[in-house]
Design a protein with these regions (language model features):
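Membrane-proximal helix-turn-helix segments that form the acceptor-binding/catalytic region
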Residues: 93-98, 120, 143-160
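Active-site proximal beta-strand in glycosyltransferases
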Residues: 103-105, 112, 118-136, 161, ...
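Hydrophobic packing residues within well-ordered alpha-helices of enzyme cores
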Residues: 114-115, 171
Length: 185
C-alpha cells in the first residue's frame, strides 16, 4: 500500500519511511514559465514541480501566489483560515489531475472542500474523519461557514469515520445513512 499525504507546509523533519509527503506549498496552481534550474533552486523536486504544473486545469490567478505559481501556506491556523482552506482546495485540484490514487481521506472539516473537489475530479471515493462538529465545539453557537463546509463534507462522503459512538450518534440520519458512518476509538 502506498500513502500520499498532502500537508500545507512541511518542515523537512517529517518521517517519510512509510508514506510520501507532498507540501501543498510546492504545488503550482498558476502557470509560471521558469527554467528547470530555477525550479531546482526553489523546490525540493523540479521534476515533480513540472509534473504538477501540467495538471493545472483551472484559472486560479485570483489567488495570491509566489514567483513559481505556488501558494505560501502558513502551516498554522492563521486569521485568514477560510482563505487557506480554499487555497488548499485549489492545490488539490492540480494534484487530482496529476496523481494516481484509489481513495481520498479528508481528516477534518478544514480539508473537506479539497476532498470534495478531488472526488469530483477523480470519481474516487471520499472518506471523511470527524472529531466533533462545530455544533459540539461551539456549544450551539455555530459558525455558518464551518457548518456549511461540514454538511457538504458529510453529504459528499462515501464513508464517514467518527472518533466515538457519541459523535456518530449526534448525526441525525436515517438507518440507511448510518451505515456509512463508523466509530473508531
Amino acid at each position: 500500500m502506498q500513502i500520499t499525504f498532502v500537508i500545507p507546509k512541511p518542515h523537512g523533519d517529517e518521517d517519510t519511511s512509510f508514506l510520501r509527503i507532498i507540501g501543498a506549498n510546492s504545488v503550482p496552481i498558476v502557470w509560471r514559465d521558469i527554467s528547470y534550474e530555477y525550479a531546482m533552486e526553489r523546490t525540493s523536486n523540479a521534476d515533480e514541480y513540472f509534473r504538477f504544473r501540467s495538471g493545472i486545469r483551472y484559472d486560479f490567478t485570483r489567488i495570491g501566489v509566489n514567483d513559481i505559481g505556488c501558494v505560501e501556506f502558513s502551516g498554522i491556523y492563521p486569521s485568514n483560515l477560510f482563505e487557506e482552506i480554499y487555497n488548499y482546495e485549489a492545490v488539490t485540484s492540480v494534484l487530482a489531475h496529476s496523481l494516481e490514487f484509489d481513495i481520498i481521506h479528508s481528516h477534518d472539516w478544514l480539508t473537506y472542500p479539497a476532498g470534495i473537489f478531488a472526488k469530483n475530479i477523480s470519481g474516487r471515493p471520499l472518506v471523511i474523519h470527524v472529531h466533533a462538529t462545530d455544533y459540539d465545539r461551539s456549544r450551539g453557537r455555530v459558525n455558518p461557514e464551518v457548518y456549511r463546509i461540514e454538511k457538504q463534507g458529510m453529504d459528499s462522503a462515501d464513508h464517514i469515520i467518527t472518533v466515538s459512538n457519541l459523535t456518530r450518534k449526534s448525526f441525525r440520519t436515517t438507518e440507511l445513512e448510518i451505515r456509512r458512518i463508523s466509530a473508531y476509538i
